[in-house]
Amino acid sequence: MLVINQKTTSPSFNLALEEYLFKNTNRDYFMLWRNERSIIVGKNQNTYAEINYKYVSENKIPVIRRITGGGAVFHDLGNLNFTFIKRGQRDTFNNYEYFTRPVVELLQSLGVPAELSGRNDLLIKGMKFSGNAQCADDTGILHHGTLLFDADMGSLSQALNVNPLKLKSKSIRSVRSRVTNISEHLAKKITIEEFSDLLIKKIIDSNADAMPYELTPDDI
């Protein structure tokens, strides 16, 4: 498994990268990535029913559709995203515990009472800090999730507010939960970069075939 700590913060590039790795390679991957301020919507969502269009337009926040289902999520540099791409393991499809276990175990080792909820979310004391989604094809599974570490909650709540004048929609709508940042629950304060390093170490230590990998110009 190749472990990538992706440094590019372009949301369109990062989403295209994980889709490319999933659809056009035959390797296993774990990737950490962060995006500049953006909204990422599920493949089946009516975008207008999920975002505060006026706020998003005025603040020039890009809205990008991903290849997995689930709700709309707000990204900024205080939000850390993780992606697993696993080949030939269709039995792990919908097994969110399997893919989120490293995050939960790492946080618990740091004294944070993280747990998986029944709705594919990770919670701390009943508050959501991570949403997860998956897709699969004949070759394997892509699982990705968000980790609110030190995100701008003000922008998050404004960007995802629904306009009360909108028409009723039959499209899938997000189930909103109370949210929290991981950083608020750490006994010892660390940066998002330090947390990223800890999570990468956790992945490498837990997988015998895992090795760090940096994307080359040829890859890009």
Could you describe each region identified by the protein language model?
Residues F30-R34, V73, A114-L116:
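Short beta-strand
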Residues L77, N81-T191, L199:
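Catalytic beta-strand/loop module used to bind and position nucleotide/cofactor moieties
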